[in-house]
Amino acid sequence: MRDFLRSLKLCAACLVGLALLSPLAAQSPADQHAAEGTVNIYNLDRDAHVGGVEIHGPISKAVVSQAVELIRSIRPDVDDLKVFLSSPGGDVLAAMELGEEIRKQWAWTAVDEHGECFGACVLVLAAGVRRIPAPENVGLQRMNFDQKEFVASLSPDKAKQKYTGVAKRVETYLARMGLPKKLFQEMAAQQASAKVRLLDAAKLKTLGLDGSDPAYEQWLRENSNEQPARSNRE
């Protein structure tokens, strides 16, 4: 937490003039439109009770709204609902909102060899009751926040206070998802760098990003590996 706050002091000083934490702030409207994320239903077979949702591009409030709507729409007909991720990052608060819905719906998260999951996307990956990432395709990166909320009319001190609050929310969120403290610590350390730190297979397991939620696994054991009743997760 201390390292995170130290980096936030530097970031807060940057906010007023440079808005370094959000690349979208410096883009033209056309570029922003091109960079918008998309959400689609993937491989849905209601008779076989399989299917998922795939997310491509930056994670924003609009993307989260679409994803939540699709997840809820197919959840009653799917046993192992999977959320496939390919995102360079995005809005931290939006990512945690999506993560909360994913965990509520007992969905899996996955990043295949053709995808990527950096920055805020890692918060979404962390929410899966089972997490299946491809090594070297998941990376820790400096977090981005909604510019309108964090920059407009804020002094450096006020901005730092807001970032401190968000840091605590991220820490609490990861703990609630059952991830080790080490993940938050390493995400915090990455705030001081503009580079992406790719995670190999061993690191993904150490940080809890490759594996299952213990509570989910316990439920499966106690119920002879049956899936939770779909009606209970609506």
Name each model-derived stretch.
Residues H33-Q66:
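STAS-typified acidic loop motif
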Residues G52-I59, K82-G89, W108-H114, S153-Q161, ...:
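Second-shell loop/turn segments in exported
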Residues L24-A30:
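Boundary at the C-terminal end of the N-terminal hydrophobic targeting segment
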Residues L81, Q147-N232:
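Charged, glycine-interspersed solvent-exposed loop segments at helix/strand-loop junctions
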